[in-house]
Amino acid sequence: MPTLDSGKVCRIVARARALDTGRPENFPEDRARRELLEIIRTLNEREQVELVALCWVGRRTYAPEEWEEALSEARAAHSERTAEYLVGMPLLADCLEGGLARFGQGCSGFEDGNL
């Protein structure tokens, strides 16, 4: 089971949604992408590894019961480009929300204003 704070995951989900679904005209895509990259880069290595594993559980590459295996693979794949890997992942927000849901968690009630 992930130990990564779900509030951090929901913050990333909100930013990823802004990037995926369009932004207000005064919030260009490159700025949204840079902000999302920065949020992920501020996570420590353990948190980045868990975020990748959570994505993989969310997209059903791994089942929740295979969490330790997903973590092990994510740990082995971790690099200085992990943030870029995540931001480049299609449907990042959906993968993260799906991962949270598979562990009985979610982002309902999360306020985008908490960013």
What annotation goes with each model-predicted range?
Residues 39-48, 90-91:
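Structural motif
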Residues 2-27:
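Short terminal alpha-helical segments
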Residues 57-69:
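Short helix-capping/linker segments at secondary-structure and domain boundaries
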Residues 8, 47-51, 66, 95:
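Residue-level detector of well-ordered alpha-helical segments, enriched
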